[in-house]
Amino acid sequence: MWQSTKNVYHAVSAFLAAFCYGFPGKKLKIIGITGTDGKTTTTHLIHHILNSAHKKVSLISSVYAQIAGVKYDTGFHVTSPNEWQVQKFLRQSLDSGDEYIVLEVTSHALDQHRMDWIDFEIGVLTNITHEHLDYHKSYANYVSTKEKLLNQARIGIVNCDDDSFSFLEANSKENQRITYGIKNNADITPEKFHFTSPLPGEYNLYNSLAAICACLQVGVSAEEIRQSLKTFKGIKGRFEKIAADVDFDIIIDFAHTPHAFEEVLPTAKKNTQGKLIHVFGSAALRDQSKRQLMGAISARFADLIVLTEEDYRTEDVNEIIDQIAKGCFAEGAKEYATNEYKLALKSTSPVFFRVPDRKSAIEFATQKLAHKDDTIILTGKAHEKSLCRGVIEYPWSEHLAVKNALKRS
């Protein structure tokens, strides 16, 4: 009942916002990107390609909004801003003479009507995996909500290798659908469209294919796309290797779902000569069923794991860690106290520690665990600028926490 009331509020608010700003979402060519994982990178990839092809384009993503070359903060823990912010940005984009805007879209924003009164030229769906089931209640509901973007768009672009594809195919509307993939017979594949990219991992191959599909549909030439993909260096907090004067690597990534772990951890492991050290937690008041899965996947790929906080809000951080630890144990990981780290380093099995304070966890990983040729990967916070404890948002920077930890090492 509460959720329905909230959705009605947003639906009315979305109309009022669109009306007040002159319905800019009906006058721009808007490319929307949704999906559980990969939507931020895909959003920025499309923007980079269009910009490199000299198109007048702006973007709104979970990292920032860039309207007419000016960057704006989109807030704490935000992927899709509220309807008033979105309409304001669209109006600024239109007034600046833009033809296109690339918009990252969440399932929450679609379900709550925050994207109403926006005509999407193209809707891109990256994948639909285990996430947000606390909100959507079932995978089928989650898929149906994501599909709203495809059905609102003139052209829908979908990943035919994803588990959601059979459902989407069975329920597709009359609009045009274009597919991309690696394993199945898609419209766009690496064999049909040859390209190179500095981005690591198979998951970024999928992100690139999605961007290729979208940009081909708006008239960017194949050669322009290929050249742009070569020059895209990635974005903040997405498998970002931190420059530091140490003999081990540090990577910051936003991965916070089981599927994302299955993508980024093997990629990090493949590029690590020594041990892979994984520092992570799980956000509170979200889908609890993913926590044990994340612990198991981490133990499958990481050698040393530091379980810590990630926006524990009004839950007990130690109970969240307990739930993650069950997955670690299930994969044969052994638990050690932090003062036993020297003994733990000799273990041939995966090892995990509990360090509830994230700052202390990063210090422990950098100062005690990491040695030559190791890799530390910090997941879950990335670009976010706050850490929620209780009901208070405390200022937080993953990058600054790493910098300060290295100063003391």
State what each model feature region is:
Residues 1-7, 213-223, 227-237, 241-409:
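ATP-dependent carboxylate-amine ligase
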Residues 2-160, 164-175, 215-218, 271-272:
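Phosphate-binding loop of NTP-binding sites
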Residues 26-28, 96, 119-250, 340-346, ...:
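Acidic, Mg2+-coordinating active-site environments of NTP-dependent enzymes
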Residues 40, 207, 253-257:
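Short, conserved phosphate/pyrophosphate- and ester-handling motifs at nucleotide-, phospho-/glycolipid
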Residues 54, 69-70, 192, 247, ...:
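Residue-level detection of beta-strand-connecting loop/turn positions
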Residues 61-64, 192, 380-382:
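Short, small-residue-rich loop/turn micro-motifs
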Residues 80-87, 143, 205-208, 258, ...:
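Amphipathic alpha-helical transducer elements in NTP-driven molecular machines
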